[in-house]
Amino acid sequence: MAASKAAKSSEDRAGGGGGGGGKEVFKAGRTLLKVLKALSLRRDSAFEANSASAANLAAEGGGGGGRAATSRSRRILLMAAFWAARRGASCAALTAARAAAFLALAMAAYLAALRARMCSRMICWPLTASLFFRAANCCLCVRGGGGGASPLQGRRSQGAVIAASSAERTTSIAVEVCLAEGTAKGPFEGWSNLCCPTRAG
């Protein structure tokens, strides 16, 4: 009897000890789970923080890139405006040169037509009154005489008289030009002065 009680008490102690050991293991497991959970939460929070900081850095970098792109586009626009202005200035200069050349040609044509018209009207054209011809006492005398006497007859000592025979044959106009000293200026430079000592009547 005493032996059976002793065995029972030893089993109870063993069972109690086993139960106590199981509780310790369970507590240790719970503690380990809590630690792992805390570590997991900490890792997640660190990952989120790193992600946020990376996003902020990317945003800042993007802003800097945007500012750089804006500055670069501004420089490009300024250069384009500069070259456009330069091309416009060169085009304006070219247009002005073309206009000047056109005006010069138009003036030359006008003067030639005016000279021809004055000659056809048989008048004396004093070149001294012209702004374009700086010739002294120089004019072209055309007189319709139908073969009659020229006002330069008897004044040949002032120069050589040249008769335009072709004009006389075609229009019966006696054209006599008195050559004076010097040469005409302007478009007639190199030509002999067209001198008319007596205005045609």
From Swiss-Prot:
Please list where the region (Disordered) is annotated: 1-22
Q: What is the scientific name of the source organism? A: Tomato ringspot virus (isolate raspberry) (ToRSV)
Q: What is the lineage of its organism?
A: Viruses, Riboviria, Orthornavirae, Pisuviricota, Pisoniviricetes
This chain's protein is named Uncharacterized protein in RNA2
Superkingdom, natural source: Viruses
